[in-house]
A protein has these predicted regions:
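Short Gly/Ser/Thr- and Asp/Glu-enriched loop/turn motifs at secondary-structure junctions
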Residues: 40-44
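Generic structural signal for residues in well-ordered beta-strands
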Residues: 38, 85, 135-137
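Extracellular/lumenal/periplasmic "stalk" regions immediately C-terminal to a signal peptide or transmembrane helix
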Residues: 1-39
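Terminal ABC-like ATPase head and other globular end-domains that cap long coiled-coil arms
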Residues: 75, 83-86
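Periplasmic OmpA-like peptidoglycan-binding domain that tethers envelope proteins to the cell wall
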Residues: 54-68, 72, 80, 90-168
Length: 168
């Protein structure tokens, strides 16, 4: 009986995740889909956003063009109240040019990734009314690459912010 219950819970979670993913991908434009990747892995929804869509270079300020995409993601987050959301900043392995950095409090990629994640969290709260207690911000620096940092394309893929949506 217990195992059957676990299977039912997992099945319900998987189907909710598929609905969530389908709703989000349907709401995104073709242009947005070039810079947003949505995946479901082990019952968790991962939304990966390209850094050049979200931020100005070397900065953690949210770009104007990110607003529409973030509004669609915020709507999904608001619709799925039984899910927690982790915002995770990631960078490539190129050290920050601290002399040229537009924000003086960025010492390295750890700082940049954490500040970028925090910016997205605050943007979701301040612009779209997402409940703060559902959101967590974290930075991974260059230590969680999804591609090789040996090529420009790989570095570009590693410069991302992930929105990770998990059942409570």
């Amino acid at each position: 009986l217990y195992i059957r219950h676990l299977v039912e819970v997992k099945s319900k979670s998987d189907s909710l995740n598929m609905v969530l993913t389908n709703n989000l991908t349907r709401s995104l434009s073709k242009e947005e889909m070039k810079e947003v990747d949505v995946q479901v892995l082990k019952g968790v929804v991962y939304i990966s956003l390209a850094d050049n869509m979200l931020y100005k270079s070397g900065s953690y300020e949210i770009n104007d063009r990110a607003q529409e995409t973030l509004s669609k993601i915020a709507k999904i987050i608001m619709d799925y109240k039984d899910y927690d959301v982790l915002i995770e900043g990631n960078t490539d392995n190129v050290p920050i040019n601290t002399e040229a950095a537009t924000m003086k409090n960025i010492r390295n990629n750890w700082d940049l990734s954490a500040l970028r994640a925090s910016s997205v969290v605050q943007y979701l709260i301040n612009h779209f009314g997402v409940e703060p207690k559902r959101l967590t911000a974290g930075g991974r620096g260059e230590f969680n690459p999804v591609a090789s940092n040996d090529t420009e394309v790989g570095k570009q893929r590693n410069r991302r912010t992930q929105i990770i949506i998990t059942p409570k």
